[in-house]
Amino acid sequence: MKILFVSSEIFPFAKSGGLGDVASSLPKALKNYSDITSIMPLYKSIDREKHNIQSTGLVYEFWVNLIQYQFEVFQSGDVLFLDEKSGLFQRDEMYGEYGDNDIRFGVFCYGVLEYIRATEQYFDILHINDWQSALIALLVKEKYKLDSKVVFTIHNLAYQGIFSKKSIERLDLSWDYFTASKIEYHDQINLLKSAIVYSDVFTTVSPTYAKEIQTHQFGCDLEQIIQDNEYKLKGILNGVDYEEFNPSLDANLNKHFDADNLGNKRAIKEDLLNELHLEGVDKPLFVFIGRFTGQKGIDQILESLNTLASSPINIVILGSGEKRYNDWFHALIGLHKNLSITIGYDEALARRIYASSDFLYMPSQYEPCGLNQMIAMKYGAMPIVRPVGGLKDSVADFDGEFSDNKGRGITLENGNAQTFINATYKALHLYLDKSKFNEIIQYNMNVDFSWDEKSKEYLSLFTDLKEGWLPERTIKKFEIPSYYNINTLKTMPVDPNTLYTYWEITTRLLNTHQLSVNQLILKAYVDGIEVDSANIYDRVGNYYFYPEMDFKKVSTKIGFIGAYGTFISILESNVFVAPNAKVIKSDNIIWRNIETDTLNTKRASFMSDTYYEVSDSLSSASILKRKELQKIIKDNQRFGSSKGGI
């Protein structure tokens, strides 16, 4: 199987974030099972001599919007580099706020496909990543008509490649593509959206993030198009390259250790404390390594530091980012004897910090995958995380249920400073129980987050696509036939983390409040607290939310934002109490409430031959087959209540 892996950055040649790490490690792991080549732009910042990058001698030309471009192909090992001769990639920064970024990366996408044409190669799989290479999916399907299957990976949905609609002509595209179902986005073009639409399969970097991006909270205004294409979405947790990140091998350390011999970890910690002018090797060391942005939970850390500075702990912070955060951290330097702050990034220092640390702070507001928590666990540190995205998929609270594919850490239920402080005190208390703490540390060091395992999920997907399998668009099982003569809002659980809601709204109700449909907002509530919301564009429709609702009261409301910015409800759903997640015994049991009013309106067409869990006021939950449910409907029997559920 031949694979072409396309990325705008690949470590160690160029890296701005996690994409660079994945673009290095994943092809390396897949090399054991396939013929894979990686390809990226040849930036000005890349040291050609250091990395032994040599010209292949291949030069080719092509036209885009009546402009001729000339590319030369360079190579280092299994990585190809495309050099555009007019200087599109000879800028001081890889990305930057350049006014022609649409041209820079759009032409790069053309250049990749023209390379395939010039060399007359066939690739079974084209694996493209993030918005910079996203246009390849459209070009493959609409212009080049290649038989290769296209897999698109979203590493961070927040970066979408949004440009003026003038880019349609600048990139030599047809205006036929400028529709809401293709690449149009608020009268602009959205390159990331184009790959969601045109790829054969699109993936994200963790299973939880794949669910989150279908919600208003995490969907970055693309949740609807993602929901529409959910049938071809797969979440695969990133892995770690243990040849690169391993305390028993790391060349950045002057001493080494592993799970069976932790002695040198203390010695490395003592050296680091001396280097950073901190005292107390027996105190727990809490660290943060990363970008200073709101997404990373920096506000939560900053608001907590003055309180934590009086605690018997040491704190080390390494990173840089937004100017306001850089300034705030700079003002804290030297104020507390147990706090060390280094603004900037030094990979060797980062490795020494990982190896010295006892706890890693990672209070991200959202985190598509995250690698730091996996690296930290390998280096004998316990992560303190928000349970979002890949953090939720890789870290479980040590006080919670055991999971053999997750490390053990401490989870933060929200983003306020007191929660962060309490978690730190909880960690301190655990640290004092040396036996228990060391048991957790050794367990974490042995959890396998390697790419050797994770790459097999990609390999399986690629193999299926090569052999002709394609995901099929299906009508969601629980969609209900539409009627326009009533006002109704139904809510029911599909599984412990999936909430289905269906609505019908009459023109009369809209006229009563002098509203149009596009002013309406759907909100989901768990135990009376709003957990998610979405804009509504149809009088009849349905929507899926993904809250945690085990044993909690769940409902939805439809309304609008009033003159003073408050939400005004015009339609409220039934309220149900979600069952215990543990009732699920197999995939053949659907975790779902059949609500009274739904039965009374005799909308049974969405029921299949699977089982449903139903409860009445006289007995505990019972399993009923479809025929029995149909009999209940026919006999107009009632069970439950209009405000209750299972």
Which functions belong to the PLM regions below?
Residues 1-471:
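Catalytic cores of nucleotide-sugar-dependent glycosyltransferases that transfer UDP/GDP/TDP-activated
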Residues 32-35, 457-460, 464-523, 527-646:
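Serine/threonine-biased, Pro/acidic-interspersed low-complexity stretches characteristic
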